[in-house]
């Protein structure tokens, strides 16, 4: 039974949506921030999201709208089901979710919590995505995962710094 019910293009579109929502969130939340440190980090992360969008657009050129091949490997089938569940999350499906999230934040600490959550969700999604993409795309996803981990570390470090200094 083929458990992967979306095309390779659909999966790449989900990844693009993640990055687009991240870009919108970092832009909106950065503009609203009163902390120079938060604003500068969000500017950097927004620039990173732009670069990631370009990477996924390049990966997407190799995928048609046909469904990715199924597999009898239960581990990959489980990944496909997980991707499908993630795909139903609003962050992955709603085009303006990044803006809505940014408008809902109350302060810098809240913005950092949302950003940390978004980065964690991205990492989880990309790990699962690595299991179903073509071999030549796995290395690119590995690099993106490493970058997302660095983003997560920077966000966590800034959150800890701000909580200690009370900024």
Kindly give the residue locations of the regions a language model identified.
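Non-heme di-metal
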Residues: 1-167
């Amino acid at each position: 039974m083929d458990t992967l019910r979306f095309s390779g293009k659909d999966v790449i579109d989900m990844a693009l949506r993640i990055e687009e929502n991240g870009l919108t969130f970092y832009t909106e939340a950065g503009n609203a921030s009163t902390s120079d440190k938060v604003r500068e980090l969000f500017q950097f992360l927004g620039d990173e999201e732009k670069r990631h969008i370009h990477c996924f657009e390049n990966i997407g050129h190799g995928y048609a709208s046909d469904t990715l091949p199924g597999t009898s490997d239960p581990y990959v089938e489980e990944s496909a089901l997980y991707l499908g569940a993630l795909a139903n999350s609003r962050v992955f499906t709603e085009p303006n979710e990044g803006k809505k999230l940014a408008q809902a934040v109350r302060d810098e600490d809240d913005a950092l919590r949302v950003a940390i959550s978004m980065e964690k969700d991205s990492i989880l999604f990309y790990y699962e995505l690595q299991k179903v993409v073509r071999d030549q795309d796995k290395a690119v996803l590995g690099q993106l995962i490493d970058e997302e981990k660095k983003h997560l570390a920077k966000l966590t470090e800034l959150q800890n710094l701000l909580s200690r200094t009370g900024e």
